[in-house]
Swiss-Prot record:
Taxonomic path: Bacteria, Pseudomonadati, Pseudomonadota, Gammaproteobacteria, Aeromonadales
Any one GO cellular component localisation term in the record: cytoplasm
Protein name as annotated: UPF0235 protein ASA_3628
Superkingdom as given in the UniProt entry: Bacteria
Pfam family membership, one: DUF167
Species the sequence originates in: Aeromonas salmonicida (strain A449)
Length: 99
């Protein structure tokens, strides 16, 4: 299963989250997933909220257009982004290699 998929006007991301990182960043491929480092700790949903906010900023969409489809309580998550207005270079490169 690829780390990034296009389904209609949605972008589906299979992510491996690294909480409590020194900075927020899309690290790159990690096996079949895209590794994303975030500064928030994995406590009381803080990491999920922070991840949604970070991805919304990266894809230039409202936070309501980013939803966690699977993996709310774990490090491995599937996230859907509705109608992204911008695609970060790391993810664009992955989409290009998929054809």
């Amino acid at each position: 299963m690829p780390a990034v998929l296009r389904e209609g006007d949605e972008l589906i991301l299979h992510l491996m989250i690294q909480p409590k990182a020194s900075r927020d960043q899309i690290v790159g491929l990690h096996g079949d997933e895209l590794k994303v480092a975030i500064t928030a700790p994995p406590v009381d949903g803080q990491a999920n909220s922070h991840l949604i906010k970070y991805l919304a900023k990266q894809f230039k969409v409202a936070k309501g257009q980013v939803r966690i489809v699977r993996g709310e309580l774990g490090r491995h998550k599937t996230v859907a982004i509705e109608s992204p207005r911008q695609i970060p270079a790391e993810i664009h490169a992955l989409l290009e290699t998929q054809g």
